[in-house]
Amino acid sequence: MKYSDMIVPATQREKADPRQVENSAGGYVYEVDSAARLRRFLVLGTEGGTFYASQKDLTKENVSFLKEYAAKDPVAFYNVLDEADADNIAPRHSTLLLALAVLYTHTDKQEVRDTIKARFTSFVRTGTHLFEFVEYVTMFRKWGRGLRSLISSWYTTKKPSDLAYLLVKYRQRGGWTHRDLLRLAHGTKDATSEVRNVIDYAVHGIVTIEDASKTGKFTTVNDDVLPEVITQFEQAKAGTLSPVDATALSWEMLPTEALKDPLTWVALIQRGNLPYTAMLRNLGRMTSIGVFSDGPTLRAVVSLLTDESRVLRSRVHPFNVLTALKTYSGGHGFRGSLSWTPKQPIVDALDAAFYAAFGNVEPTGKRINIALDISGSMGARLMDSNVTAREGSVAMAMAMLAGDPLTTDTVAFTSGAGSWTVPSLRQRFAGYPSGITEIGLSPRRRLDDVVRETNLLRMGGTDCALPMLWAHSNKRVYDAFVILTDNETWAGSIQPMDMLRTYRADVNPEARLIVVGMTSTGFTIADPQDKGSLDVTGFDASAPAVISNFIAGRF
């Protein structure tokens, strides 16, 4: 069947929906309002329609819209930030911190600033967040009474033990230290005496009783004065406390030399001081120094990795587990010279954890068409990973099926054979349905079996419009098309965005398009003014959440 019977070229320049507006090119798109633009910025880190897996620097030059919105309607701006934080839609907290800094420095409404101060520790939860916020806010203003009071409140409103933990775990970033910030804020009069002791430690370090009598500084190492985490941190740093006995310290707080000792990691595993994702990141390091050379520790870590309740509590995405599996089984990292001989029980445990993590995928409630590019170049590896683009795309499809099993279809696509003519355009379009193969995908199938199946399919060029052409031809109704490719579309002669507009006009006006460039080549397809299209350039651990939130209409 030829598509010329179904495609109506004129629909690109006609309203498919009363809510559409005319763009600068004479076409009709859904207008992106200010709140939607802000939500998109919080998720993507840009005002356009592209999510970059390789994080780009956030600077004051790329937030002109944010400044205008903050000055015009600061209450609405704040409400978007509050909702986005509560819904956890920003994969990188940096974008929310930058937006918060813009709002704080560009509103003249004192009640908005007061609200920010009252909720400051909810947005700025860790020491790293605080350092980032200060870096951003000082791009727009100098230190004044209001900013000093705001930063001071981050320290003075916490419990002594909580503040001590944050000071020790997040000691510096981007050239800032807590000592710097406290000296600039110079306002801790609202702190309790216990909190003031912790603040004195951050500014002056440990001061002995003898030194205190000379300098007038009160802070001492006495357990009655400072929380245990500071005491143990200083003792471990000085070598007077074995890391094995430093029960109050997380692995990030321990001296670098201590992390070269297998017994340190054994103690962390036995105490449960190693969160699930931290364990995934450090499996190679632990193997390289012999942590798993004894049976009991190896069995313990296998048990932790395969504990389904721990997997679900960690909320780790299957793609992240797959990355850990491929990295560990590969026997080397991608930064530095670290290498190891993989332990097969750990490889098997990670394989089991991959499937267990499907339980962490939240449903979108949408009808989805997942299209897997099967061109030969999909064998390329994703950035900083042993995962190939083909493996990553299949894993992503399996995860999405786990979230919406009854409303998701999966197809493999390449450029189809043949062509058809649209007389009104005096053009011939390539891409018959022969380029589409439906795949019986399920989260219960083995990943390697599905990858093997897609490898056997006929390969050709890349035509990212073809999945929508196929759905249009077969009258399949979808809310979203997710196209997983590694290459710029080139084989077809109708643009994917044009095909999306045709599909919207004839089938579903609300249909969304996500084109995921698994290996970033810098190309983009989405119209940045079209709220229903998104490019994902490159693929990393944060990309699945971006895709899911976009399909669900959360930004």
For the regions a protein language model found, what residue spans apply to each?
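Long lumenal/extracellular ectodomains of secretory and single-pass membrane proteins
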Residues: 1-388, 404-555
